[in-house]
Regions:
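Cap/insert and terminal regions of metallo-dependent hydrolase folds
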Residues: 151-252
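Structured catalytic core of nucleotide-sugar glycosyltransferases
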Residues: 5-15, 52, 57-64, 76, ...
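Active-site environment of divalent metal-dependent phosphoester hydrolases
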Residues: 12, 59-63, 85-87, 124-125, ...
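Metallo-beta-lactamase
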Residues: 82-137
Length: 263
């Protein structure tokens, strides 16, 4: 049985647990090691099953607890792009014992889970998202920190059974909010984040490709709220003919996991 469980999602930290029948992978470790291990225990995850930690990019809300976590889950290898691994090494975030793998165009395997990456547009060294090919044949994708939804991202996540996709900010809240103009422009740029409306616009094509589980993630604490993100997404899915109930599940990833597991 496959499952994806966002342990933390948002401005303060991000970490997602993906589990299959024979192993598990952790995507990002953006909170303290204790917080992540406590969250794993809360959702019934097993740190001993984690064969790999994959990192999307080197910003602190994705790597805060990385080094202590790798010192705890010593069996886990570290997978990321060559540019991100170089940035992590320079920042002293990789323990000496940890095996690192720079992922390229190939599909890697960890704990019986296939792992591929796709390029994303964000202001980091070499950011990426990931697709996970589960032992039961399901495909799970994680794509956050997207300045823009490119054809590369669309092609990679198409056909996913479940997608964790960024819905970072409400445009009106951001424009009217207290952030400096320069920061607002950075967030709205092609190297920033994906708005609720931009996220919602992508969901109908995902639905057509077979996606039935949608998780809205990385919501801004100051420039968004779950009801706005859900409303934008629900409207476009309904217009696209999505059925409710178990046929099409739409969730918002909470800042701290509330026990919700998808799939």
């Amino acid at each position: 049985m496959s499952k994806i469980c966002p342990l933390f999602s948002g401005s303060t930290g991000n970490s997602t647990y993906i589990e299959g029948a024979t192993g598990a992978v952790l995507a990002d470790v953006g909170m303290s090691c204790k917080a992540v291990t406590d969250a794993l225990q809360y959702v019934g995850g097993d740190i001993e099953k984690i064969s790999a930690v994959v990192i999307t990019h080197e910003h602190i809300d994705h790597i805060k607890g990385l080094k202590p976590f790798l010192n705890t889950a010593r069996q886990a290898m570290l997978i990321s792009t060559a540019g991100t691994l170089e940035a992590l090494e320079a920042a002293g975030k990789i323990p000496p014992h940890t095996k690192t793998i720079a992922i390229g165009e190939e599909t890697l395997e960890a704990g019986g889970i296939g792992i591929s990456r796709f390029e994303t547009s964000h202001d980091a060294a070499s950011p990426c998202g990931y697709c996970f090919f589960m032992p039961d044949g399901r495909k799970i994708s994680v794509c956050t920190d997207l300045g823009v939804m490119t054809d590369t991202v669309r092609g990679a996540v198409s056909g996913s059974d479940a997608v964790l996709i960024e819905s970072n900010y409400d445009i009106d809240m951001l424009k009217k909010g207290p952030y400096p103009a320069e920061l607002k422009m950075r967030i709205m740029s092609e190297c920033g984040h994906l708005s609720n409306n931009a996220c919602a616009a992508e969901l109908p094509e995902l639905l057509k490709s077979g996606t039935t589980r949608f998780i809205l993630g990385h919501l801004s604490r100051n420039n968004n709220n779950p009801l706005l993100a859900l409303s934008a997404a629900k409207n476009t899915l309904t217009e696209a003919g999505a059925a409710g109930g178990s046929d099409c599940i739409l969730e918002v990833a909470a800042p701290k996991n509330n026990g919700v597991t998808v799939l």
